[in-house]
């Protein structure tokens, strides 16, 4: 692997007011002028961009989760990840832009003797929360990854055990939670919560529960304890969502718009996926007009892995392709689904049905539906927790899959973990639906020994190899 040293990359336009981006006058030839806040804001934007973009060169997880499919070019819906070198394209921004900028921001914060102690602690805390989120994505995508020797002068960093990384992430997150106090952090450079450190504290507790439930099948004790301590301190409404606000103008528009909005592109590469649309049609889901466009009054999804006529199928909705459409790192609906599962598994945090209903209602109202529509939806026997088919994993898994629309990464994690819905591989698939990304080819070239050791440790560097928490 290329030596992971700190590069000061050209910075994106960053924020100067509530969830807005504006120009910073940065002398890109003189890294000493770059502030800790600029680096933090840049790291946040790069993280969200990487998770949000639908570019087939970087992030194809909406295809894999059959939320969308392609009209013409079927390599990615059929799980070809080598033609465009997707593992490298997805891996690189996390290390080179996000984590390195966070590390440098932390260094500058530590060295700034003019900072008030409480502000310094808050800056360190929100930097750590963002880093923990990023590291969890790396582990959930690849398994063992460079961690303890990453971002150092080590030319060929070792790959750390994924479960051990997770354990350390809990330690880091707990430390961040403990040091947050009311007050400022990065001011306008906090592009996620606009300097609302109390909101970051809720996000930290919600993230802790997210990591915990991911471990539920392999370390129930840790998972239960973490959720028990954070259950009452996470998100309690959609107002708490970790939502990143984009702008109407480039380069700060949502990357979805760059790939789908006719103002920015003439390409017509994406249509709704048959799997999700059919499931939503079956239960008359009120979110359909917010998720997709209609075709002659109906919602129609294209087949996965075959060519689809653009005009014949539903497309991502006009709302989703707007340049200022916000991106979610985590939301209240997800927290309620976590609590529903914790209640079903361990009898903690209330009843499964109460949290299940709250999760679905939160999703419907977030997208623009009404409370009355949510009640009607939940009253259907195939949706109601008491009568829906299957175990708690199936009940929650099916509804969480719908709620995680447009969040391909999160839907992919939950599908692997809960095993619902039972997705079928694409037509003419090149492999199983991937359970992980393979290591980038550059890693095999530059860090071969460590990559090979990691591949052996995880059971093979293959897309069908399960991440350590995926045991069923």
PLM features: residue spans?
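Residue-level detector of short coil/turn "hinge" positions at structural boundaries
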Residues: 58-62, 288, 350, 403, ...
